[in-house]
Amino acid sequence: MNLVFLWAALGGAIGSSLRYFVGKMMPSKFLMFESFPLGTFSVNLIGCFIIGFMGHLAAKKVFGDDFGIFFVTGVLGGFTTFSSYGLDTLKLLQKSQYLEAISYVLGTNLLGLIGVAIGWFLAKNFVGVN
């Protein structure tokens, strides 16, 4: 029996549970904003960093395909929340919270890209996998 789907599902359950936990731990008031989806924002940035790190290791074949499916597809797929990101942005726009919406979109994308680059750099330079 092919366990690929089981690995992805198990990882997805873990990632989704972690996403829910992080989301519940974050306050809704953030910096100057009364309502900011900080939980989703944080999860996306953490996920971007981790996928950058793991992406480099996967490219260098540091771990097998089963672990990659479990962790990258499953755990990170369940953990990161770009679908929730779209919904959160729409809700901010619907409430006419334009500054929050723009800050959320720009912050998630710019800091997410930076997180991926830092994760990749650290995996490449400090884990010893070149």
Swiss-Prot record:
One GO molecular-function entry: metal ion binding
Keywords per UniProt: Cell inner membrane, Cell membrane, Ion channel, Ion transport, Membrane, Metal-binding, Sodium, Transmembrane, Transmembrane helix, Transport
Membrane topology note: Multi-pass membrane protein
Catalytic activity: fluoride(in) = fluoride(out)
Positions that bind Na(+): 77, 80
Pfam families the UniProt entry points to: CRCB (PF02537)
Gene Ontology annotations of biological process type: cellular detoxification of fluoride
InterPro entries: FluC
Residues that span the membrane, as ranges: 3-23, 38-58, 67-87, 102-122
Activity: how regulated: Na(+) is not transported, but it plays an essential structural role and its presence is essential for fluoride channel function.
GO cellular component, one term: plasma membrane
Domain of life per record: Bacteria
UniProt subcellular location: Cell inner membrane
Main location (coarse class): membrane
NCBIfam families given in the database record: crcB
Family note: Belongs to the fluoride channel Fluc/FEX (TC 1.A.43) family.
Function field: Fluoride-specific ion channel. Important for reducing fluoride concentration in the cell, thus reducing its toxicity.
Protein name: Fluoride-specific ion channel FluC
Organism listed in the record: Helicobacter pylori (strain J99 / ATCC 700824)
Taxonomic lineage of the native organism: Bacteria, Pseudomonadati, Campylobacterota, Epsilonproteobacteria, Campylobacterales
